[in-house]
Swiss-Prot record:
Enzyme Commission code: 3.6.1.13, 3.6.1.58, 2.7.7.96
Gene transcribed to yield this protein: Nudt5
GO MF entries: 8-oxo-dGDP phosphatase activity; ADP-ribose diphosphatase activity; ADP-sugar diphosphatase activity; identical protein binding; magnesium ion binding; nucleoside diphosphate phosphatase activity; nucleotidyltransferase activity; protein homodimerization activity
Binding-site residues, Mg(2+) 3: 112, 116, 166
Domain named Nudix hydrolase: residues: 57-197
Location of this chain's protein in the cell: Nucleus
Protein name: ADP-sugar pyrophosphatase
Free-text comment on the cofactor: Binds 3 Mg(2+) ions per subunit.
Source organism of the structure: Rattus norvegicus (Rat)
InterPro entries hit by this protein: Nudix_hydrolase, NUDIX_hydrolase-like_dom_sf, NUDIX_hydrolase_CS, NUDIX_hydrolase_dom
Motif segment (Nudix box): 97-118
Claim: Hydrolase is one of the keywords in the record: yes
């Protein structure tokens, strides 16, 4: 990124944005050159990608963690596999999508879950807005955990309702063996596991692992 030495050697109290210049804009995203001040007083530039759809919403999107619960079955995490042109291959992801105008994060999560998987669920919890790839864009999402009653008649044979141009395969994996299953699937050619899914699986593994023992100090 470009830098410019400050005229005043006194460092600013905090880093801040000085200007944002639009370089290119499409239907869904725009590309900007962001000029900002660093802690030493230098002016720097950053190449930034932004969505065009936020318009005052609490976040751009929702990412859904769907927990499928059925009698006499292990809990499963419902994922979606779809082709992602920027990756040039398939990705295994949580159901997700943009929040529509006037829509709450919870409503968006339930809508996206039903559209992409066919399942209907209940909200367990909703996170505050969290960033997705802050080194590249300002995109934010709510992470929404949804429980699915797999014994409900409407969830026995769910039928996805994909939008135009959406081609999604639903994959349910056991929660207690999620990381192992992801590693096996990730070894397939042209399939990449989304970082949010993998981080969730790692967290499950660490949470269920033997607690770390405090080492004895040697004097």
């Amino acid at each position: 990124m470009e830098t410019q030495e400050p005229k005043d050697s006194s460092p600013p109290t905090e880093q801040r944005i000085l200007s944002e210049e639009l370089i290119s804009e499409g239907k869904w995203v725009k590309f900007e050159k962001t000029t900002y001040m660093d802690p030493t007083g230098k002016t720097r530039t950053w190449e930034t990608v932004k969505l065009t759809t936020r318009k005052g919403k609490s976040a751009d999107a929702v990412s859904v963690i769907p927990v499928l619960q059925r009698t006499l079955h292990h809990e499963c995490i419902v994922l979606v596999k779809q082709f992602r042109p920027p990756m040039g291959g398939y990705c295994l992801e949580f159901p997700a999508g943009l929040i529509e105008d006037g829509e709450s994060p919870e409503a968006a999560a339930l809508r996206e879950l039903e559209e992409e998987t066919g399942y209907k669920g209940d909200i367990a919890e909703c996170s505050p807005a969290v960033c997705m790839d802050p080194g590249l864009s300002n995109c934010t999402t709510h992470v929404v955990t949804v429980t699915i009653n797999g014994d409900d008649a409407g969830n026995v044979r769910p039928k996805p309702k994909p939008g135009d141009g959406e081609f999604v395969e639903v994959i349910s994996l056991p929660k207690n063996d999620l990381l192992t299953r992801l590693d096996a699937l990730g070894a397939e050619d042209r399939l990449t596991v989304d970082a949010r899914v993998y981080a969730y699986a790692l967290a499950l593994k660490h949470a269920n692992a033997k607690p770390f023992e405090v080492p004895f100090l040697k004097f």
